[in-house]
Design a protein with these regions (language model features):
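Short C-terminal boundary/hinge segments that cap the last helix of small helical domains
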Residues: 63-73
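A short, Lys/Arg-rich alpha-helix, primarily the initiator
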Residues: 1-21
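Residues within the helices of the helix-turn-helix
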Residues: 16, 27, 56
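Residue-level signal for the short linker/turn that defines the boundary of a DNA-recognition helix
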Residues: 13, 23-24, 50-53
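Hydrophobic micro-packing sites on short alpha-helices
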Residues: 55-59, 69-70
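Short alpha-helical DNA-recognition segment
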Residues: 23-42
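Short, conserved catalytic or interaction motifs in soluble domains
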Residues: 45
């Protein structure tokens, strides 16, 4: 079984990649999602564990389906 922190780090790196592909700064993305920039930073660094509700907000902010947030290895 994978280490939870490892999965959080992988998810965060993937989210950061998706955000960059969308051409959004961390601050612009956080504003678009209605979240604090430091919270988004924590998710991207793998130190915050977002809820399902926040995952949905992140997907909407990136204008992607929520399942695309989990397409990382």
């Amino acid at each position: 079984m994978k280490n939870t922190s490892s999965i959080q780090a992988q998810f965060g790196a993937h989210l950061k990649k998706l955000r960059h592909q969308s051409g959004l700064s961390q601050e612009a993305f956080a504003d678009k999602c209605g979240l604090d920039r430091t919270y988004v930073s924590g998710i991207e660094r793998g130190v915050r564990n977002p809820t399902l509700e926040v995952l949905n907000v992140l997907a909407q902010g990136l204008e992607i389906e929520i399942k695309n947030l989990f397409e990382f290895k």
